[in-house]
Amino acid sequence: ASAGVAVTNLNLKPGHCVEIKGSIPPDCKGFAVNLGEDASNFLLHFNARFDLHGDVNKIVCNSKEADAWGSEQREEVFPFQQGAEVMVCFEYQTQKIIIKFSSGDQFSFPVRKVLPSIPFLSLEGLAFKSITTE
């Protein structure tokens, strides 16, 4: 099932992380993980693009407030393959979210609106197996 999945009671607090495991469809053009208040307000929109919107093998991150996008941050690290398993960990620090990959690579994205905890998570384009918090 690569349809969207949403969790509305995530309650991810600073200092904790959420780990997402799944598999990337063989014909995947891109997949996204969103963390935030709700579907209109994202602290982080994490979009891995194999071939989407003119980006090839790029990670594009952004924030969204009241359905308005912020400024994009592009990353060169791209530890994903179509048809492969994926594991990504998102660690919420008050001022930033650290994105960690099973490859050992990591980068961070600034938190533009601090929340006491992150209630909302959604996935698009990924056949997910598990979502765990620690």
Curated annotation (Swiss-Prot):
Keyword terms: Acetylation, Extracellular matrix, Lectin, Secreted
CDD domains: GLECT
Galectin domain location: 4-134
GO molecular function: lactose binding; laminin binding
Location in or out of the cell: Secreted, Extracellular space, Extracellular matrix
Keyword Acetylation among UniProt keywords: yes
InterPro entries reported in the protein's UniProt record: ConA-like_dom_sf, Galectin-like, Galectin_CRD
Pfam short name (any one): Gal-bind_lectin
Binding sites annotated in the UniProt record for a beta-D-galactoside: H45, F46, N47, A48, R49, H53, N62, W69, G70, S71, E72
Modified residues (N-acetylalanine): A1
Record's GO cellular component terms: extracellular space
Predominant cellular place of this UniProt entry's protein: secreted
Role, per record: May regulate cell apoptosis and cell differentiation. Binds beta-galactoside and a wide array of complex carbohydrates.
Assembly information from the UniProt record: Homodimer.
Protein name (record): Galectin-1
Species: Rhinella arenarum (Argentine common toad)
Lineage: Eukaryota, Metazoa, Chordata, Craniata, Vertebrata
